[in-house]
């Protein structure tokens, strides 16, 4: 499947409020196709690409900052609910949702990263230019959405939270996780991961100056739930 269709699928699997924050792949492709060699055409492409990268980076940073706060709040909530069985179910759902949203953000980072690389490759192929190398270097050095260590760490810590006896009692854990997995965010998270596997299998952008791959979570627990198709998140 072509990248444009996989990107469309990934956007559909994302949260509604995220869907206008992805790389404008179709529009950037149109701009590349219209480049005639004039400085004005090149400037228009560079401006459009820079605006898109700024959009992606700002959104990623905003979400990361929000997730850091939510992560801290959940840790506090777990401590308070350790002796209140009635609160455990609600916190369990919050943890599963939060975990899913963070994985969706990692997928968001990765697919936009690949999209930028593909657009740069198309640009250089059409113009004979060499824009990919400096842009890739700038992204690696200065852009937040390339640096996913904080979110990846919180994903791992969130999985540890789900394993804590105070939040997931051993006798109730399987049923609790199964119930939580029916929730839209969780199911769409797994579907998004499967889409990213398709994207990586079909990607041909790797090269000396291409954007290096990002790491997505490789969780046996998460991948044990593989729904046949995503469900809409209203």
Curated annotation (Swiss-Prot):
Explain what induces or represses this protein's expression.
Answer: Up-regulated during cold stress.
Could you tell me which residue ranges the SPX domain spans? Answer: 1-137
Output one GO BP term: cellular response to phosphate starvation
Q: Which CDD domains match?
A: SPX_AtSPX1_like
Q: Which InterPro entries match?
A: SPX_dom (IPR004331), SPX_prot (IPR031142)
Annotated region (Disordered), positions in chain: 202-234
User: Which tissues is this chain's protein expressed in?
Assistant: Predominantly expressed in roots and leaves.
What Pfam families does the entry give?
Answer: SPX (PF03105)
Q: Can you tell me which residues the record assigns to a coiled coil?
A: none
The role this protein plays is:
May be involved in maintaining cellular Pi homeostasis when plants are exposed to an external change in Pi.
Name of the molecule in the record: SPX domain-containing protein 6
Q: In the UniProt record, what gene is named as encoding this protein? A: SPX6
């Amino acid at each position: 499947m072509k990248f444009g269709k996989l990107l469309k699928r990934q956007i559909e699997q994302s949260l509604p409020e995220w869907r206008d924050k992805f790389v404008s792949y179709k529009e950037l492709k149109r701009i590349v196709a219209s480049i005639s060699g004039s400085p004005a055409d090149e400037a228009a492409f560079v401006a459009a690409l820079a605006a898109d990268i700024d959009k992606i980076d700002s959104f990623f940073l905003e979400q990361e900052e929000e997730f850091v706060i939510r992560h801290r709040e959940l840790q506090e909530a777990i401590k308070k609910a350790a002796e209140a069985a009635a609160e455990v179910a609600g916190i369990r759902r919050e943890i599963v949702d939060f975990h899913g949203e963070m994985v969706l953000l990692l997928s968001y980072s990765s697919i936009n990263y690949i999209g930028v690389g593909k657009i740069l490759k198309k640009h250089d192929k059409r113009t004979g230019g060499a824009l990919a190398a400096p842009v890739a270097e700038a992204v690696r050095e200065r852009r937040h959405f390339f640096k996913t260590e904080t979110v990846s760490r919180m994903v791992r810590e969130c999985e540890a939270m789900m394993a804590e006896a105070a939040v997931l009692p051993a006798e109730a854990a399987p049923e609790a996780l199964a119930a939580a997995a029916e929730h839209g965010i969780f199911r769409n998270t797994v579907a998004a991961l499967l889409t990213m596997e398709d994207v990586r299998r079909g990607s041909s952008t790797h090269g000396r100056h291409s954007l290096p791959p990002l790491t997505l979570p490789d969780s046996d627990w998460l991948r044990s739930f593989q729904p046949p198709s995503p469900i809409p998140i209203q």
